[in-house]
Design a protein with these regions (language model features):
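Class I SAM-dependent transferase core
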Residues: 1-36
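Conserved SAM/SAH cofactor-binding pocket of Class I
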Residues: 30-115
């Protein structure tokens, strides 16, 4: 059974992937709290896993749009579920995308790229 991992404003489901929430994801997600971004920032999360860092970015930067790329099917499924269930669903995008094979038109200016 997939028991959610609860954070401040959202719950994270991770039952379809082998990559579980770890300290590194929580630290990476907390790091931008010491930084500022422009209004309506555009953030890219490469290798998003279950979406925890993307969700933390959306929580921290209330008007940012976060694009997440993930290639592993289970993680992609979990991230899709987590994004849809979050209060930030309208600002989160998940794509089955590989960084190495991204097409030029998929690259537009990002204010922050995390991985």
């Amino acid at each position: 059974m997939d028991k959610p991992f609860y954070l401040k404003q959202f719950a994270l489901h991770q039952g379809n992937t082998a990559q579980r929430v770890g300290t590194d994801a929580l630290l990476l997600g907390a790091w931008p709290f010491v930084h500022t971004l422009p209004e309506k920032a555009h953030i890219l999360d490469v290798g998003a896993g279950t979406g925890i860092v993307s969700l933390m970015m959306a929580q921290r930067f209330s008007d940012a749009v976060v694009e997440a790329w993930e290639v592993e099917d289970g993680a992609l499924k979990d991230a899709t579920t987590n994004f849809a269930a979050s209060p930030f669903a309208d600002r989160l995008r998940i794509h089955s995308q590989d960084y190495l094979h991204a097409k030029r038109e998929q690259w537009h200016p990002f204010d922050l790229i995390i991985s």
